[in-house]
Amino acid sequence: FIKPDAKIEDAYATYYMGIFFPCDDRVHQPRDFRVQGLHKNAAMILGLDEGTEAPDVYIKLTPKNRQRQIKEPYVCIAAQASGQAKYWNNGRGWINVVKYLKQKGYRVLCIDRDSVYGQGSRFNLIPYGAEDFTGQIPLQERIDLLQYADFFIGLSSGLSWVANGMGKPVIMISGFTLPLNEFYTPYRLINY
């Protein structure tokens, strides 16, 4: 990758990759990422096939520690995201989910990076009743936790993609983006 301040004399082509605001900016992103999906936008910008899954580039994420560390049945959740609009802004949503899962005999492990995250006047906390497995730990440790989870519940965020990449059933809570923006899952809660 080339740093923004670097001067390149003879580049064939350069691309801006990412999410740009306002969302109607069609110079850097020809399509709205909330409608088209980031993975399809990147493919379109690079002139690649925009199919949902490319079997020749499928990556299976595997645990490093193959020994089960938690003997009880458990579920991993991730309640944090990169923007407030992606959060599940239902005041009792996570509380009810955690309570229900515990009644069913599951331990509920929150594997987000931060136990508290936000900006300005909006902050989100780890869901009440969930066990705190948050922290500045390597992604591999989260993969190790996901390995023996019965399933994963999360937002339209990176950890949902990680769980999906491991072949875990993912319950996706979305609403900021359309369902086609993420990978396919039959378990989706729409928040709009």
Task: Give residue spans per PLM region.
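Catalytic machinery of carbohydrate-active enzymes
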Residues: 1-192
